[in-house]
Amino acid sequence: MQNTDLTVNLDNYDVEVNVNVKKDVAIIYSSKIQGISGLPAGSNGRALSLLSGGIDSPIASHLMQRRGLDVMFVTYLNPVTATEDTVHKITELAKLVNKFNSRNSKLLIVNFELIMKQIMEHSKTSYRLIMLRTFMMKFSEALSERYNLDILITGDSLGQVSSQTSKALTIVDNASPMFIARPLVGLDKIEIIAKAKEIGAYDLSILPGNDMCSNFTPTNVAINPRADEAIESFKNIMGSIEDYDQLVEDMIEKHITVVEL
């Protein structure tokens, strides 16, 4: 040991050296790298995320993973309008976000044509998109029961599009008693895009391929839907289906493609 008479300025230092002493090892480091932070995925339960081919839903899924959820994915498609590019893009987005799960998950690709047909025939035109989202929630609830999932996740951002106004979201919420997490609800598009670039989802999300909502949107969407008119459309659709519960069971068994991630 040698006394060099050197001094240390603890208030205005040039380099900070940290020492983390464990039982059998000591770790010495001078820099820290920020990780994704949050809670360990899977520590807070499991969720079903409604995944589209857009920018929002993958980020919503990832943010809820950071709050301790393992996430399974579902996408609703019409085989008449869904292209191979659309299916490929959604699958790749699911694979990307799945990397942040604590275990490998699944993507459920639902052929929603049977229910879409009833919506087209029995809903007021301006309420079609709201009814589509309503029945997606109802079907997602059934899937959650089948796979023992705790909550639903959507990429809704308040006021971003006509079907995401406060009144429209309230109507959709009534479709299921399950908690619907909307982690993007207060973010604007610039913030969402920044997060998409952060996890590498942005370039995938902007590839060609329309989701079902974009193909199903009428020219006159109800921006401020009335609850009584929404209930009327809902009852008309349900009345046109002979046995809704049986239809759901049949669709789960015969109209879903399961992709292991």
Give residue spans per PLM region.
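Active-site adenylate/phosphate-handling loop in enzymes that bind or generate adenylated species
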Residues: M1-T7, K32-N44, M116-K117, E121-A194, ...
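Hydrophobic/small residue at the entry helix of a nucleotide-binding pocket
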Residues: I55-D56
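Short hairpin/turn module used for nucleic-acid contact or packing/dimerization
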Residues: V161, A168-L261
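Short, conserved beta-strand edge motifs with alternating hydrophobic and charged residues
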Residues: V74-T75, L107-N111, D150-D156
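General small-molecule cofactor/ligand-binding pocket signal
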Residues: N9, L108-V110, A181
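S-adenosyl-L-methionine
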Residues: K95-M131
